């Protein structure tokens, strides 16, 4: 299971005023963006497999060295009583609620840098778009992943973790995108580690 450490974001500005602000550690154990149980067959209970990302965030927090940053945890529900696709996104309404909760933390603390420990790939969306809003044109995103995560609602795979980069670009489900504080131009996104095979619609977008 891929446990994405969304190093969302050591976006550094040349403007020295931001150097006075602090780095925070954001524990973001969101799992609803993934739909992975069918691939994790070694876990007998599919619900436990689905929630594996939640445990992954706790493990990363335990393993990552403590550098003295303030630490905040985004409240994430572990309820899995009903998973449903809404407007092309699995568990959309839960993701919207948790997106708001993450943004509330950032808007109150106003960090200059964020170390995000997740969680599936979509935990990068809130930190990156927060930093894009804070630094305006002085920020870029390096996406290190085997997948480009440029899926859109309506594609064959409805899980939001595969839509993370398109969400950062301001594309995707309107209810989610409307919560995000900024978008990142495709010209400021660098992909590293992308595999050389993808579904046809992904190849076209790349």
Regions found by a protein language model. Give the residues of each.
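Sec/Tat signal peptide C-region and signal peptidase I cleavage site
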Residues: 15-19
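Conserved alpha-helical scaffold segments that buttress catalytic/binding sites
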Residues: 21-206
């Amino acid at each position: 299971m891929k446990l994405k450490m969304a190093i969302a974001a050591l976006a550094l500005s040349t403007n020295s005023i931001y150097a006075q602000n602090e780095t925070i550690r954001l524990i973001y154990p969101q799992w609803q963006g993934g739909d992975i149980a069918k691939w994790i067959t070694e876990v007998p209970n599919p619900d436990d497999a689905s929630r594996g990302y939640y445990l992954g965030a706790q493990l990363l927090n335990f393993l990552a060295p403590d550098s003295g940053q303030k630490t905040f945890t985004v409240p994430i529900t572990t309820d899995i009583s009903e998973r449903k696709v809404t407007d092309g996104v699995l568990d959309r309404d839960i993701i919207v609620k948790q997106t708001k909760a993450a943004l509330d933390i950032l808007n109150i603390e106003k960090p200059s840098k964020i170390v995000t420990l997740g969680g599936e790939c979509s935990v990068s969306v809130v930190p990156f778009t927060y930093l894009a809003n804070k630094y305006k044109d002085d920020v870029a995103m390096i996406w290190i992943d085997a997948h480009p995560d440029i899926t859109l609602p309506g594609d064959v795979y409805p899980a939001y973790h595969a839509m993370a980069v398109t969400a950062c670009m301001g594309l995707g489900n309107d209810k989610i995108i409307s919560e995000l504080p900024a978008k990142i131009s495709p010209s400021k996104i660098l992909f590293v580690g992308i595999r050389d095979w993808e579904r046809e619609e992904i190849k076209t977008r790349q």
